[in-house]
Swiss-Prot record:
MF terms (GO), sorted A to Z: ATP binding; ATP hydrolysis activity
Descriptive protein name: Protein ea59
Residue pairs linked by disulfide bridges in the UniProt entry: none
One Pfam family cited in the UniProt record for this chain: AAA_21
Length: 525
C-alpha cells in the first residue's frame, strides 16, 4: 500500500524507499491561502520521481488555516474533506510516466480533481478552490489537457469552430469557419483576414470579442463544427480570450478584463487603452504591465521556459538580440536572493525590479518594446484552447521583425494548444500562413464577402501577394499610376526608362513593358 509522509520545508527525504510519497510543505502564501506542497514519490520498483507542485485544500478552509497545519503527517488516504490539484500540466506529465495502477492510486489517495472530476460540482463555491487551486488553471484544463496527458495522450487537439454574425443595420449575415489541425505543415494555428482599410476586418474581430465576453449575445456567436451537427460552443470552450491592439485611433473600447477562471472564459486585453477610464495608457503603465507579466512567467517553470524560447526566436532580429533580454532572468533571480523577505507578487518587489531593469526598457524602440510586452503577456496568459485576436500587428513592426514575431506566436500557440486570428493589410502576414487559413475581406456597402485567395500564400513573393489582395488598389495607385501616366503619353519604353534615369526596379520594368504592349495592341488600360 502506498504511504504518504508530510514534511516541513527543507525536511529530509531518504535516498531509498518503495511505495512511498513525500509531500514537502512549501509555505507559499497564495493570495492568503497556504496550500502548496512539492510531491516526490518512490514507485513500486523503488524509483525516485520528482513530480512537482500540488495544491491541497479542504472544505470550509479559511485563509488563516494552512493545509499543512490540519493534514495528518502520515496517511494512506486523505479524507473526502480534502481535494488537490497539480499546479501545472508538467505535474501530470511527470505522473504519466508512472505505471497506471501506481499513479491512479496515488491521485485517488490525495483526492485529485482530475481523477475525481465529479467533486467539482460539490466544491465549486469553496473560496480556497477558486482563489488558490484554480489560480492559473481552468476547468477546461482539468477536464481536458490534464486528463489527456495523465493518460499518455497528446497535449494538443484540433479546432473546428465558426464565427457567426447575424444581419444588423449596416451589416450582412456572415459565417466564417476555422480549422486547426494538429501537427500540420505549415502550421494552421494562425488565421488571418486581409483587405483594404474600411472593409470590416477590425469590426469582425470586435464582434468576436463580444461573442466571448457576452455569450448570451444572439447577434455575434461562435459555433462548434463536427460532422453531425453545428451548435454554439459550450461555456469554457476557450480557456481564455486575449485581444491585442496597439491602435490609438480604433473607437472600440475593450471590455473589462475577466481573469477569474471560475467564472468561465477569462478575458485579457493587451494594448494602449485603459478600459476603466477610456483613456490611453502611459509608457509607465505599459512597463509596469510588462513587469507584472514577466514575473508571472518566472514563477512557473513551464512559462519561464516558453518565455526563454520566445526571446531566442525573436533574437533573429539583430537589434532585438543586441538587447540581451535573457539577462532579465538573472536580474530577477538576483533580486529574489537579495530580498528574500519580499513576496514576488508584492508591489514593492515590482518597483524594485522595475528600477533594476529600467535601462533595458528605456533603450528599446517602440516596435521592439511592443513585441517584448506582447509576447511576455501572451506567455503569461495563453493556455489550453486560448483564442488570441490581434488587430494589425504590422503597425509598429518592420517586416523581418513581424515575420519573427508571427513564427514565435505560432510556436507559443502550438505549445499551449491555442489559436490566433489576425486582422491585417500586410502581405508579410499572408506570407507566413497557408491559403487555408487566409480570408480576403471584400465589402460593397452593407455586404461583406469573404473568399480564399486564388493562390497559395505561404512563402509566396510579396509582390504577387500584394497584387492578389489589392489588385485594383495597386493598379490605380503608387508606381503603377505613375507608369500608367507615362504610357498614356505615347512614349516608348526606352524614353520612359530614360525619363526615370533608369531608376525603375525589375518588377516595375516588367509592369511597364506589359502596359506598353497592351497600349500598342490597342487595349485600354
Amino acid at each position: 500500500m502506498l504511504e504518504f509522509s508530510v514534511i516541513e520545508r527543507g525536511g529530509y527525504i531518504p535516498a531509498v524507499e518503495k511505495n512511498k510519497a513525500f509531500l514537502r510543505a512549501d509555505g507559499w502564501n497564495d493570495y492568503s491561502f497556504v496550500t502548496m506542497f512539492y510531491l516526490t514519490v518512490f514507485d513500486e520498483h523503488g524509483e525516485k520521481c520528482d513530480i512537482g507542485n500540488v495544491k491541497i485544500g479542504f472544505v470550509g478552509q479559511k485563509e488563516e488555516v494552512s493545509t499543512y497545519s490540519l493534514i495528518d503527517k502520515k496517511f494512506s488516504q486523505l479524507p473526502e474533506m480534502f481535494f488537490s490539484l497539480g499546479e501545472s500540466i508538467d505535474y501530470y506529465v511527470n505522473l504519466s510516466k508512472l505505471s497506471d495502477g501506481f499513479k491512479h492510486n496515488l491521485l485517488k489517495a490525495i483526492q485529485d480533481l482530475v481523477v475525481w472530476p465529479n467533486r467539482l460540482a460539490d466544491i465549486e463555491n469553496e473560496s480556497v478552490l477558486n482563489t488558490s487551486l484554480l489560480r492559473g488553471v481552468t476547468l477546461s484544463e482539468i477536464h481536458g489537457q490534464f486528463a489527456r496527458v495523465l493518460n499518455g495522450l497528446p497535449e494538443l487537439s484540433d479546432f473546428h469552430f465558426s464565427f457567426n454574425r447575424k444581419s444588423a443595420p449596416g451589416f450582412s449575415d456572415l459565417t466564417i469557419p476555422f480549422e486547426v489541425t494538429v501537427n500540420s505543415m505549415p502550421s494552421t494555428n494562425i488565421h488571418a483576414f486581409i483587405g483594404r482599410n474600411g472593409c470590416g476586418k477590425t469590426t469582425i474581430l470586435n464582434g468576436m470579442i463580444g461573442a466571448i465576453t457576452n455569450p448570451e449575445n444572439n447577434e455575434y456567436f461562435f459555433s462548434e463544427n463536427n460532422r453531425l451537427i453545428e451548435s454554439r460552443i459550450p461555456k469554457g470552450y476557450f480557456r481564455s480570450l486575449v485581444s491585442v491592439s496597439f491602435s490609438a485611433f480604433d473607437p472600440f473600447t475593450p471590455p473589462k478584463e475577466q481573469p477569474d477562471p471560475a467564472k468561465g472564459t477569462q478575458y485579457f486585453y493587451i494594448g494602449l487603452k485603459n478600459a476603466a477610464s477610456n483613456s490611453l495608457k502611459s509608457l509607465g503603465d505599459l512597463r509596469l504591465e510588462f513587469i507584472s507579466a514577466f514575473i508571472g512567467c518566472m514563477r512557473v517553470d513551464r512559462k519561464r521556459q516558453l518565455w526563454l524560447e520566445a526571446i531566442k526566436k525573436l533574437s533573429s532580429d539583430e537589434n532585438f538580440s543586441n538587447m540581451e533580454l535573457i539577462s532579465l532572468i538573472s536580474k530577477y533571480e538576483e533580486l529574489r536572493r537579495n530580498e528574500p523577505q519580499i513576496q514576488v507578487d508584492d508591489d514593492k518587489f515590482t518597483k524594485l525590479f522595475y528600477d533594476n531593469i529600467q535601462k533595458y526598457l528605456l533603450r528599446m524602440s517602440s516596435g521592439h518594446a511592443i513585441v517584448l510586452f506582447t509576447i511576455t503577456r501572451l506567455v503569461d496568459v495563453v493556455g489550453e484552447k486560448s483564442l488570441v485576436l490581434f488587430d494589425e500587428p504590422e503597425v509598429h513592426l518592420h517586416p523581418p521583425l513581424l515575420s519573427a514575431f508571427l513564427r514565435t506566436l505560432s510556436d507559443l500557440l502550438d505549445a499551449r494548444n491555442g489559436v490566433a486570428i489576425i486582422a491585417t493589410h500586410s502581405p508579410v502576414v499572408l506570407q507566413e500562413v497557408p491559403k487555408s487559413c487566409m480570408w480576403k475581406v471584400l465589402r460593397s456597402r452593407e455586404a461583406i464577402n469573404i473568399i480564399r485567395p486564388d493562390i497559395e500564400t505561404f512563402g509566396e513573393n510579396l509582390g504577387v501577394l500584394t497584387r492578389e489582395v489589392f489588385l485594383l488598389e495597386v493598379t490605380n495607385s503608387g508606381y503603377h499610376h505613375l507608369l500608367s501616366q507615362s504610357v498614356d503619353s505615347e512614349l516608348s519604353y526606352e524614353t520612359i526608362l530614360k525619363n526615370y534615369n533608369g531608376q525603375i526596379g525589375l518588377e516595375g520594368r516588367t509592369v511597364l513593358k506589359a502596359m506598353i504592349m497592351n497600349r500598342d495592341e490597342g487595349k485600354v488600360q
